[in-house]
Amino acid sequence: MKINEIKPRMNNVETAGKIIAKSEPRRVDTRYGPRSVADVKLEDDTGTINLSLWEQQIDLANVGDIVSIKGAYVTEYRNEIQLNIPRSGTIEVVIKDSNKQDILEL
């Protein structure tokens, strides 16, 4: 699914894109106790979307990586939609640091 096709309250979303920005992890209190979360901006050829990475997911992907996301759900926060990956969902790095690869191809 392309990013511009993603709408609020969708479930079981599968998409892919390049991580173009990533925040430093921060601690938040959840109903499961304190957890770490980082926000990333995911981009494809149709647009961008915010994505929350929790705990172990944070170290899986970095700026420049192209990732595949499966089983995500969509929420709306401050009038912007964002992807969330539940425990049953996955994020997989398809190409590690595509920026370096682009440079090598030149």
Tell what function each PLM region has:
Residues 38-44, 82-86:
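Short, acidic/hydrophobic/Gly-rich beta-strand patch recurrent on exposed beta strands
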Residues 7, 31-32, 41-42:
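Short secondary-structure boundary/capping segments within folded domains
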Residues 14-16, 39-41, 50, 68-70:
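Beta-strand secondary-structure signal
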Residues 1-4, 53-55:
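Short structured motifs
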Residues 1, 35-37:
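Short beta-strand-initiation
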Residues 3-16:
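Short, glycine/small-residue-enriched coil/turn segments at secondary-structure junctions
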